[in-house]
């Protein structure tokens, strides 16, 4: 059976950036998350079977600056003073993660706490897995980042990402 570009590992990261320019606030969020030096390609929401979840500190050295890297990313930006923004990734891991795939969900919102946004994303992933398999996941998790726009109205960007390693 043909097997294309299937990630072997994944790590989770998040970041926040602030700047008077929107694009530069995104760059600052990527830097804060530690993934600014890669050419990121966003993909949809499948956690492949037998994909090992590793710490960011283990995953980053496996990647090369300029490399095309696949990611499931949630991103949110605003320059509205005092606006709270959130970006979250939820993950639902099947009971048998070696044989079965799981789900990743992206959630971005306004006004939510980091905990609420993270749990919402986690529930989204859990529901996507359940509606496919009719089974509860073996485990769920999330990564979330929130920030509040400063009083000067500088652009603020938050990101959360599941970063795949082939």
From Swiss-Prot:
User: Recorded E.C. number(s)?
Assistant: 4.1.1.19
What UniProt keywords apply to this chain's record, in alphabetical order? Decarboxylase, Lyase, Pyruvate
How the cofactor is bound: the record states: Binds 1 pyruvoyl group covalently per subunit.
Which reaction(s) does the protein catalyse, per the Swiss-Prot or TrEMBL entry? L-arginine + H(+) = agmatine + CO2
Q: Where is this site: Cleavage (non-hydrolytic)?
A: 44-45
**GO terms for biological process?**
arginine catabolic process
Q: Which cofactor does it need?
A: pyruvate
- Enzyme class, one word? lyase
Member of which family? Belongs to the PdaD family.
Protein name as it appears in the record? Pyruvoyl-dependent arginine decarboxylase
Natural source organism: Methanocella arvoryzae (strain DSM 22066 / NBRC 105507 / MRE50)
């Amino acid at each position: 059976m043909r097997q294309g570009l299937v990630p072997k590992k994944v790590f989770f990261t998040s970041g926040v950036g602030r700047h008077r320019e929107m694009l530069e606030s995104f760059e600052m969020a990527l830097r804060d998350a530690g993934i600014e030096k890669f050419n990121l390609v966003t993909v949809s929401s499948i956690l492949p079977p037998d994909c090992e979840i590793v710490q960011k500190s283990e995953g980053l050295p496996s990647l090369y600056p300029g490399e095309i890297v696949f990611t499931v990313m949630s991103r949110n930006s605003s320059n509205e003073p005092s606006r709270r923004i959130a970006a979250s990734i939820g993950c639902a891991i099947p009971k048998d993660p070696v044989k079965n795939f799981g789900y990743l969900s992206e959630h971005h919102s306004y006004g939510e706490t980091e905990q609420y946004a993270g749990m919402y994303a986690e529930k989204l992933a859990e529901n996507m897995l359940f509606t496919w398999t009719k089974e509860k996941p073996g485990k769920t998790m999330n990564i979330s980042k929130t920030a509040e726009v400063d009083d000067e109205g500088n652009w603020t960007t938050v990101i959360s990402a599941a970063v795949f390693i082939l």
